[in-house]
């Protein structure tokens, strides 16, 4: 069974024993979990309406975003990471809303309500899409971890999955 949610939702489900394993985007508090850090990095950027001037850019800078209506994640640990990227300009941003999952924020972007700060792989713009992704510059990247409860006894299938994952990352 696949379950989608933000890191806080996924960790809560793991803690309650409702799911065995979670795939979480950093930054995230993983102190009470066993984890495997994946090798790839996710890229931060802006989800913009395809017709906007921002959509025509190769990348966006702090200066490009200062006056735009922005939607950002509701996760405070990630907001702190974004604030570090913006430095002293963060307090001058026009943040109009927060989101827990990018899907609804992307719909708001599509309807011209604002621009969402997001990870690239969380949206899947097609040729018929009304939104696009433009990376931040300087580049902001984040890692991904696979987590599970410490000292958890798993089914043979889950145990095998974790071992296969560990083996594949050693190769």
What residue spans do the PLM features occupy?
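Central regulatory/effector-binding core of bacterial HTH transcription factors
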Residues: 1-30, 98-99
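A local structural motif
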Residues: 1-2, 87-97, 130-131
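Short loop/turn segments at beta->alpha junctions
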Residues: 6, 61, 100-101, 119
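Beta-alpha-beta core module
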Residues: 30-37, 41-43, 103-151
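Flexible hinge/capping segments at coil-to-helix
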Residues: 30-44, 48-70
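Short helix-loop capping/hinge motifs at secondary-structure junctions, enriched
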Residues: 51-61, 78, 138-140, 151-157
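Secondary-structure junction motif
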Residues: 55, 68-90, 154-163
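Extended ligand-binding regions for polar small-molecule ligands
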Residues: 63, 143, 147-171
């Amino acid at each position: 069974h696949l379950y989608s949610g933000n890191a806080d939702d996924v960790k809560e489900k793991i803690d309650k024993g409702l799911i065995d394993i979670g795939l979480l985007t950093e930054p995230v508090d993983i102190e009470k979990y066993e984890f495997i850090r994946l090798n790839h990095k996710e890229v931060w950027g802006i989800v913009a309406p395809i017709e906007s001037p921002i959509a025509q850019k190769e990348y966006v800078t702090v200066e490009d975003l200062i006056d735009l209506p922005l939607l950002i994640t509701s996760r405070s640990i990630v907001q702190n990471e974004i604030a570090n990227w913006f430095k002293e300009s963060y307090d001058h941003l026009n943040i109009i809303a927060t989101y827990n999952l990018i899907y609804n924020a992307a719909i708001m972007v599509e309807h011209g309500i604002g621009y969402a700060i997001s990870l690239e792989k969380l949206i899947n713009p097609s040729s018929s899409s009304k939104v696009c992704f433009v990376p931040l510059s300087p580049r902001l990247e984040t890692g991904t971890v696979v987590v599970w409860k410490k000292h958890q006894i798993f089914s043979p299938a889950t145990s095998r999955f974790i071992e296969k994952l560990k083996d594949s990352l050693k190769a």
